[in-house]
Amino acid sequence: MISLSARLKVNLESLNGVETVGNFARHRTAPIIVHDKQNSFQVRYVPVVSGESIAHGYQTLLVDICKQMGLPIGVYSSRYEFIKFSEDNYLSDEGISPPRDYDDMQRFEVDVLTNDVVADVGGFLYTGRNSVKRTSRIHVGYMIPALKDTDAAALEAQFHVRYLQSKPQKGAGQQATDTQQPKLAQSIFNVEVASAIYTLNANLDVDEIAVPSIKFGKPAEESKLSKLENQKVSRKKAAILALGQLFSSMKSGAKLSRFLPNSELLSIVVTETSFPFSVSPGNGKDYISATIQRVEKASEMHQKAGIS
């Protein structure tokens, strides 16, 4: 199990919008619980970036890495469309037959895994007659302002204008007809941007990559299971590399072409354990030392129980 948490200083980002009201594009916000100066709890609404958005960015990086490493990628995943074998119409495009019954579910899962590393690492849900689910091996949460630094988080709408000089707006000395709509010389729009000290957590269950999760029914073909086993090391490397690129490139989110954030990785903590463990979130500057203390205690607990 690989677990990590990071603190990032991000200025002027519009990575995750939720809706457009007229000419106003809103940033995603969510409620969090913080301590106030009187040491009591209160609710604050703050800018956030959803885990869905971050996971999409991770899987996009995973696709690119798998292509470079010669690992299999499905038809839709190769287009960065992560619908992941969810319906029969998509299965036919991927060349995979749906599960006939419960005994056929392992065969179906293994067919999907051998066809697409993204479905292996990121999970999938087939919603046909005999539904099949594979839980994602990558777990990411919302990127939120650090709870001890929520005063360093703000939202503001930025005013923008697109101007069409070559075809000025009709109306000034020229009446528009019924068939000729007025041309707008100015197009006004507002985009809400955020700045904050963000924290982001992620876990990667490396040991379960390239391992079928369905343990019942008729076993899958031995040749396909052997193929997964032979690719296991490469698939793990690809998943870990994509996680590293996610934090090093910050290639995740919306409006990167005109609202590329001014971002800086302040600190990061990473653990690798043989047992389930999640690092302490980067809500305060002491999260690295807190993680070290916790992982030492967890290791001691497993050793006393005779678990390495």
Regions found by a protein language model. Name each.
Residues I73-Y76:
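Non-heme di-metal
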Residues Y45-Q59:
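Active/ligand-binding-proximal structured segments within catalytic/core domains
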